[in-house]
Amino acid sequence: MTRGPEADTELRVAASRDALVSASIIEEVAAWGASHGFPSWVPGSFTGLDSVGMSRLRGDIAAGGLHLVWRGDRPVATFSLLERDPIFWPFAGDDALYLHRFAVRRLAAGAGRHAVEWCLREASSRGRSFVRLDCLADNPGIRRYYERYGFTAVDEFVIDGTRYCLCEVRVSA
């Protein structure tokens, strides 16, 4: 449990019961993005206990990597910080942590900043040199968001017609 800059903001490692909470935040962000022309996840991809999205969240929980950001008694953001990313970074070494499934409810200004800054500190405290992530290459808003924290694009590629951007930020020398 980590307190944020706002007195009532708290970051917690998710438990198995939190998969549905995380999924609901991601689905809310996906629906908003789809309705405003900012693609992220496909709406519905985290709906249902047997969905691919839920399977990934359960795997993240098992790895101890899924987190929720709370404001008071309300979950307002979710993300996974993982040791490896064999899909998007298969040849990367052990010098990074990987940020995935980062979603912040629209009403939760500042919660995303708290989460990203915590990820950067956490990677540094574990002796990692980088935090890495993938995002949709065709979403300039999310790319600008990550650039504010020092992330830079290191590669782009296409999977099933979707363009992805790989980004990283150095957290220690």
Describe these PLM feature segments:
Residues S51-L68, Y98:
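A short helix-loop-beta-strand connector motif used in the catalytic cores of GNAT acetyltransferases and
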Residues L107, L133-R143, I159-R163:
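Conserved beta-strand-loop-alpha-helix junction that forms the acyl-donor binding cleft
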Residues P90-R106:
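Conserved acetyl-CoA binding element of GNAT-fold acetyltransferases
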Residues L68, R74-E83, Y98, A103:
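Conserved beta-strand in the GNAT
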Residues E27-R56:
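Conserved GNAT-fold acetyl-CoA-binding loop/helix
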Residues A123-C135:
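Conserved GNAT acetyl-CoA-binding A-motif
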Residues M1-L20, S24, A173:
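Conserved N-terminal entry element of GNAT/NAT acetyltransferase domains
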Residues A109-R121, R144-R148:
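Conserved acetyl-CoA-binding loop-helix of GNAT-fold acetyltransferases
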